Amino acid sequence: MAAPGGAASCEDFAEFQELLRVMRTIDDRIVHELNTTIPTASFVGKVDPGQTCRELYESLMDAHTNRERIIKNCISQTSAVVKTLKEEREKAHEDAALLKQLRKEQTKLKLMQSELNVEEVVNDRSWKVFNERCRIHYKPPKSQ
């Protein structure tokens, strides 16, 4: 399996999904992260919540950008495979193995496209939690 910052293998959908699961750890742990790093009123002087929120913001942005890049790259690669298989099928109408491979790749493409929707939900949830806890400590740049 590829490293979270590296290139993903788009051949095996289960491996692709596992990579995304690992890369989504930051989003899964955001509530815990905020609860353990953003101080309550009684501990305000011991931690700089502005710095903590800024670092978390940067980590979230990097994670979201990397995952989106990987998903879109795999969609692009799989789309190219589907296109090639469709062209081959036009030449060999009766090839059952080719048709089976085409259907498999089309299914994988649909699953990868659905990961974009999952990504949107995960990101929205993370930004909602981040904004609820960090809005008074850190104002992110307007690009979000």
From Swiss-Prot:
Coiled-coil positions: 82-120
Gene Ontology CC terms: mitochondrial intermembrane space
Assigned protein family: Belongs to the MIX23 family.
Superkingdom field: Eukaryota
Protein name: Protein MIX23
Pfam families listed in its UniProt record: MIX23
Keyword Cell membrane found: no
Alphabetized UniProt keyword annotations: Coiled coil
Species this protein is from: Taeniopygia guttata (Zebra finch)
Record flagged with keyword Aminoacyl-tRNA synthetase: no
